[in-house]
Every structure is written in structure tokens, then in C-alpha cells.
Amino acid sequence: MAGHSKWANIKHRKERQDAKKGKIFTKWIRELTVAARQGGGDPGSNPRLRLALDKALGANMTRDTIDRAVARGVGASDGDDVEELGYEGYGPGGVAIMVETMTDNRNRTAAAVRHAFTKCGGNLGTDGSVAYLFDRKGQISFAAGVDEDSLIEAAMEADADDVVTNEDGSIDVFTSFSGFYAVRNALEAAGFKAADAEIVMLPTTSAVLDLETAEKVLKLIDMLEDLDDVQNVYSNAEIPDEVMEQLG
């Protein structure tokens, strides 16, 4: 699991940037709408909607905005359909990149994603070209200060895959994709309140980057993240701490 913390440093950098851009609201409005469309408007019986609801509230989205997004999903007409589409490719330095999107116009989204890859020295690939380098997992994160021993015991009892303590004292619990909601609920019932919980694509191998390549890869990730239809971007880039410090 050593690669997870390296992957996380890119993720946390992106989260700070997303918050500044205000894109996080758009992201969770779409997720609320799609989750409600697929599983109904009751978070009690729709785990995906419940997760999106928690995320939206955590981003300080108003209840009114949340309710409108859910209502739009439940009552959406065929003409309002939003598709979930994934794109795969390679960035500078041979870094594998996965892009998750939600779109009402697949041609527009495909063109925009392809343009980003091309402009930043990467190549958009075909389905399956890099997906085999990633595993879909659940990640449940806890802030520093949580009782580590008790959390590990509870996580193992809930059939979590692994528990990783990060340098800053925060703890990540990793689960299988299918077991994510069960583990999350079990930890919550045991009294552990997560700081974050989500389904992620974790790389099974990593590409260690120098400063020059890291700058190029992060430029591509930034450009992809800036696209309106993009929800998540994952890569197998591993940026050493000393390089990340130089990047700021």
C-alpha cells in the first residue's frame, strides 16, 4: 500500500485547487442527480446518493440546492440524460491516466479530453489501454487523532482490505469496491466518523517522476480537471516528496 500516500499527495493538491475554483459544487450536483436517477431519491435505500449527499453537505452546499439536484434526477426526462463515460490514456513519462466524466454530449466531452491529452504531450487511448493498471477500491479517510488501534480492529472486523497510517497522522481504510458501503456503515456504527469516503481508482504500479516530468503531468491533470464534464482524474504518477515540495 506504499503507493497510496504518493498518489494521495496529488489528490490532495487537486482538492485544494478544486475548492478554489468552485468546481466542487458542479461535481456534486451532477453526482446527486445521476445517483438519484439510478437508485431513487431516498438516501436511506440508495447508498450512492447518501455518499453524494454527505459530500455535498461537506462542501457547504445548501439543502435547497441539494434537493433540486435530487428532484431533477428523480424526475428527469429522457432529454436530460447524463451519461457516465470513462477515458484512458498516457501522459508525459508514460504515466497512465484514467478520466471519469458525466456528460450530456459525448462528442463534446471526447473532443475536449482528447485535446487536453494532445496539448500536454499525452495520448488518449482506447478502452482498456490503462484500466488494467488500476483497481477500483473504497477509501475511507479519518483525521489525525483517531484511536489507531481501535480503528484498525474495527476495520478488520468489518472486512476492510487494508489500513494505512499517513505521515500526518491521518488514517485511510481501503476496501473492496463491493464492500465499500458495508465497511463504511460498520465503522460509523462503531463510532468512527470519517473525514472523507469515496470510490477511487488505485494504481497497481507507479511511475516515479522527476521535476520536469511532474510539471508536465500535473499540467495535463489540471487541464483535464478544468473541463466541465470531468468528475475525477486518476493517475499512477508517483511524485517524491522533495519534488512535490519544489512544485509547491
Swiss-Prot record:
Taxonomic superkingdom: Bacteria
Q: Read off the SUPFAM superfamilies from this record.
A: YebC-like
What InterPro entries does the database record attribute to this sequence?
Answer: Integrase-like_N, TACO1_YebC-like_2nd/3rd_dom, TACO1_YebC_N, Transcrip_reg_TACO1-like, Transcrip_reg_TACO1-like_dom3, YebC-like
Q: What family is this protein classified in?
A: Belongs to the TACO1 family.
Q: Does the keyword DNA-binding apply?
A: yes
Offer one example of a GO biological process linked to this entry: regulation of DNA-templated transcription
Keywords annotated in UniProt: Cytoplasm, DNA-binding, Transcription, Transcription regulation
One function term, GO molecular function aspect: DNA binding
Its subcellular locations are:
Cytoplasm
Protein name as catalogued: Probable transcriptional regulatory protein Psyr_1407
- What are the annotated GO cellular component locations? cytosol
Q: Name one Pfam family in it.
A: TACO1_YebC_N
